[in-house]
């Protein structure tokens, strides 16, 4: 007798299997809906989101709305994306800085520049950050090929007048130092394109001589003590980006429309009560960020949805600082907070640029909760 062969009806087996698959998928869908409606699942999601925000250093005010956690916010994702982008940029910068024309220095072990630097006058770029260096030596004038001076987050208290002899200088970044003034000789650097003096906290004015800087397209003097827009800034005819947020401005000059090329204007965290009609003459302005706490008069056309202008009004309720002492720790804490604010706003502005339908008027409400 040969082998016994059992023949199945394949169509019956397939129908049985497909029925079971459909039942399993229906059960999965029903279970997913149950979990979605479950308060415990929502609480777990919010708790995980809050924990992640805290690890990233995002303040509570940015992900809470009216006392509720907003897990749909894209800010955390944006900050993470920016962090990855910055890391990638740093790798590229590091490769670039291996050039014999680039000098790089960082770390709190450095209290002054190395003596050997004086002999390397061929250098074109300095990248010095997060050190305890307080003084930039006068021999900097020997570096006639210098194009970039990137000196953020040090302890620099003053810049030498000799900096004005760097005729090829294009970028100067002295943000988050301890500067109280800028030398008028900087106005002799006629090829300067970018100037960043943000986060020095006590800087109150820029010298009139900087009016000579006709190539400047970017100025950041945020987080200082400016009570008005410096006259020299109004004479920078090619200026495209001006950040004067977190200062003591109570009004804007009536001739603000002299900045015909201005595209981005950041004014938030000041004491402005109105915006002048001259703002309407800034035809190239595409981004305007103000604090709406004190504003009582805004030209209607600025909020017109038909214009390309993104008008952002931030309504902020800062933590009460009553009783805070002006100690060194308090100053450093303020410096760190201002630095985080700038990073947050960069992420927010980049997010605005990526939206397909950008609101013409945006309000951010933040609050503090004391337990």
UniProtKB/Swiss-Prot annotation:
UniProt keyword annotation of Repeat present: yes
InterPro entries reported in the protein's UniProt record: Leu-rich_rpt, Leu-rich_rpt_4, Leu-rich_rpt_typical-subtyp, LRR_dom_sf, LRR_domain-containing
Gene3D superfamilies: Ribonuclease Inhibitor
Pfam families (alphabetical): LRR_4, LRR_8
UniProt KW keywords: Leucine-rich repeat, Repeat
Superkingdom of this protein's organism: Eukaryota
GO biological process: cellular response to leukemia inhibitory factor
Signal peptide stretch: none
Keyword Metal-binding: no
Protein name per UniProt: Leucine-rich repeat-containing protein 2
Classification lineage: Eukaryota, Metazoa, Chordata, Craniata, Vertebrata
Underlying gene: Lrrc2
């Amino acid at each position: 007798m040969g082998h016994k062969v059992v023949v199945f009806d394949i169509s019956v087996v397939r129908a049985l299997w497909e029925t079971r698959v459909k039942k399993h998928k229906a059960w999965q869908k029903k279970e997913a809906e149950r979990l979605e409606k479950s308060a415990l699942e929502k609480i777990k999601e919010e708790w995980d989101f809050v924990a992640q925000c805290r690890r990233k250093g995002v303040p509570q005010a940015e992900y809470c709305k009216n006392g509720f956690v907003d897990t749909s916010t894209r800010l955390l994702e944006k900050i993470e994306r920016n962090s990855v982008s910055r890391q990638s940029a740093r790798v590229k910068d590091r490769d670039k800085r291996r050039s014999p024309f680039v000098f790089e220095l960082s770390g709190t072990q450095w209290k002054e520049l190395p003596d050997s630097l004086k002999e390397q006058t061929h250098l074109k770029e300095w990248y010095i950050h997060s050190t305890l260096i307080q003084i930039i030596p006068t021999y900097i004038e020997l570096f006639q090929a210098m194009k970039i001076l990137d000196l953020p987050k040090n302890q620099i208290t003053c810049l030498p007048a000799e900096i004005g002899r760097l005729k090829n200088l294009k970028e100067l970044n002295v943000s988050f130092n301890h500067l109280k003034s800028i030398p008028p000789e900087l106005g002799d650097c006629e090829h300067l394109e970018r100037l960043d003096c943000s986060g020095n906290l006590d800087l109150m004015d820029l010298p009139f001589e900087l009016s000579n800087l006709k190539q400047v397209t970017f100025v950041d003097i945020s987080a200082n003590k400016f009570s008005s827009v410096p006259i020299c800034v109004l004479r920078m005819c090619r200026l495209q980006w001006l950040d004067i947020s977190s200062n003591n401005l109570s009004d804007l000059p009536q001739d603000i429309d002299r900045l015909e090329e201005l595209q981005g204007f950041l004014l938030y965290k000041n004491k402005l009560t109105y915006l002048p009609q001259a703002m309407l003459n800034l035809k190239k302005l595409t981004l305007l960020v103000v604090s709406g706490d004190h504003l009582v008069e805004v030209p209607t056309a600025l909020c017109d949805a038909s214009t390309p202008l993104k008008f952002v009004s931030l309504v902020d309720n800062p933590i009460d600082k009553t009783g805070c002492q002006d100690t060194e720790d308090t100053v450093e804490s303020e410096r760190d907070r201002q630095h985080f604010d700038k990073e947050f706003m960069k992420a927010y502005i980049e997010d605005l640029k990526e939206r397909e339908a950008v609101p013409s008027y945006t309000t951010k409400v933040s609050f503090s909760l004391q337990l």
